[in-house]
């Protein structure tokens, strides 16, 4: 039993390091995507979406989980919020700090595992994340942690997708394979291999997220499909979505 548990921990640790290594290699290209978004229509879209999700709250304390090069971090700081941002990848944090300086905002960045937060309970008014949970070995534990650090009445906003669900449902197939942008010579094969092995490749979302968040005691859970494909038979494939949950 002890040997099995140790083997599982070692496997998970190895996978986590593989994930970190890949995103370290992608940091420079990924920051190009983030800057394009911050200077384009995506910024306007997310400002509106976040404002609506907060329902008029001003200057809240925010945790950006898996911040990458800092798209949400910079955006929320420019909106006047107090932002703490974490990422497990050193190079992503380096790019995020550069972007915060470039756009003239103050953000508190820390290196941290999204599945094991180092903050006190009830610390934040808003926990926000984008394209992170699919990338985790223990997504349910991550949700528990994100909810733990939310204040009572706080809001969780998670933007994600069924990126590797084609592993489970062949209908998704090539229709939903992730389009990698600004690769800058980095091969996507490692993250595709990892993504296909992770738990979220076997769960249809946001239905799975709704169940988990309700089980965690969320007082309100809503989801909005932001990208989908309609098949000839009338069946709908959910590609991307945004989940809003209230603690």
What are these regions (language model features)?
Residues 63-65, 69-116:
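Class I SAM-dependent methyltransferase SAM/SAH-binding core
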Residues 154-161:
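Conserved beta-strand signature within the Rossmann-like core of class I S-adenosyl-L-methionine
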Residues 161-233:
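C-terminal alpha-helical "lid/dimerization" subdomain adjacent to the S-adenosyl-L-methionine
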Residues 241-247:
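C-terminal lobe and adjacent flexible extensions of AdoMet/dcAdoMet transferase-like proteins
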Residues 2-58, 71:
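Conserved class I S-adenosyl-L-methionine
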Residues 126-139:
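A short SAM/SAH-binding and catalytic strip from SAM-dependent methyltransferases
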Residues 140-152:
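A short glycine-rich, Lys/Arg-flanked "PGG" loop and its adjoining helix->strand segment in the class I
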Residues 115-126:
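A short acidic, Gly/Pro-enriched loop at the edge of an enzyme's catalytic core
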